[in-house]
Amino acid sequence: AAAKNIKPNIRVIGVEPVGAPTHFQSRAAGKVIKLDKVDTRAGTLAPKKTEILNFELIQEYVDDLILVDDMSMQKAAEWLWFEFGVAAELSGAASIAALSDKVFETGPRNVCSIICGSGTDGIP
């Protein structure tokens, strides 16, 4: 929300695990839904149901939601560790996984990826 308020023309893309598409499916349904199950190692990205406030904020400020699999997040976390010494958990490496897998077209523009979480589930 803050980034969009500062620069309204930026494109914000959310990333979720294939095995826990809570926001992705809620957006498609146009309302908050509850998943029957989640199947991902990225635990902090795996709620069965989101809160209405989160849903509303995503509807307003996130331009697109994309899905990445656990293996892609694992590879991204390993890359961050071995190349930069950054210990990111799988959830924190999700945006790098999306960029690495070229899940969406970035084109010739600046890209900012938020990397968070200092868990060790992504480090071999």
Q: What is the meaning of each model-derived region?
A:
Residues 51-108:
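Active-site-adjacent helical/loop segments in soluble small-molecule enzymes
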Residues 1-60, 101, 106-124:
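Glycine-rich phosphate/pyrophosphate-binding loop at beta-loop-alpha junctions
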